[in-house]
Amino acid sequence: MKRDIGFWLLQVPGWLLLFYLVYAQAIPAFSYETGVAMGTQEPADQITEVGVAFWYGFAFADLVTYIPLLAAGLIGHYLGKTWGRVIICAALGITFYWPVVCLAAVMAARNAAGWNLINESPYWIILPLIALWGAWGLWFILKELQQGNKS
């Protein structure tokens, strides 16, 4: 397997994202209040109890679905395994999807009663970058597969 710049642009940010997800999402899946104390989750007084339930749902889903897929996909891709490419594509699809959902929710909730998110800027800076990386990663894996079929 050729380990060009694209390979590393998938692997390195992927591992950084995985470690961040374990810290920012897996821990709050067990204790949302711990996530609030760590600064990785928003408190109910800023986003309402419904907002907390929404963000907790993402944390729990990340714990049981996204984190395992991303970890297995990164390992399998690193090893050059076909199953790794399939699994990393599943994780990259989620990587593209969830930032879009979160940004849509932040926009839709702006004028909702009880929604007092102090600063949206981090959402609008980081989440589009994550979504773009996910979309790029899908394209890159497709390119890898096409090149593999030619050799």
What are the residue ranges of the model-derived segments?
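Topology signature of small-to-medium multi-pass alpha-helical membrane proteins
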Residues: 1-151
